[in-house]
């Protein structure tokens, strides 16, 4: 047995053998886009992905698909929200994301490929020194975002008129299982909901299958909904 291990040990020393390196951190673009477009962030050299949310009856309620460059920029992003009857399809063109059908300029970018402005809604984004979006503002609202040391989104606080909505997420202490998390939602400091998610992961530490439990505590009795999330991911 010892002799059989020698070739691989030697290969590890010389070339690293044939193993996948796990990237534990999230890029500023991936983390920030996941905040704004409401999907689970992914790690590593993602080439394209599709994230599908299904209800307890197996019906698709939401789907997010994206393609990324080797540098981690979103070349395209498509969102299908059946619950709200919304479809958004964006394609990268220099410093803008254009509508995939009308080619209208929808989102202005800053830096390499980070969010800067949504002109039609009067929304502008601010980034920190590391390139993560930490603020979004318009005439009607102010939003602040939080991240941990690995760039994982820890939640956001939205202020609009006399209302403050805060979402705080607590991920697993296992750095591989960041998408196993709990979250609490507060409206004007009153708890109105909670979320729990647990996942199975691939060898890039990205979620493949997840169960998402959402509890609406703003109604009495509280209403619990259970969803399944399926991820299809291709890598460079």
Swiss-Prot record:
Main location: membrane
Record GO cellular component, one term: plasma membrane
Residue positions bearing lipid (S-diacylglycerol cysteine): 17
Keyword Cell membrane set for record: yes
InterPro entries reported for this sequence: UPF0257 (IPR010646)
Coiled coil start-end: none
Gene name linked to the record: ynfC
Signal peptide feature range: 1-16
Similarity remark: Belongs to the UPF0257 family.
UniProt KW keywords: Cell membrane, Lipoprotein, Membrane, Palmitate, Signal
Lipidation (N-palmitoyl cysteine): 17
Keyword Membrane: yes
Cellular compartment(s): Cell membrane
UniProt name for this protein: UPF0257 lipoprotein YnfC
Membrane topology of the entry: Lipid-anchor
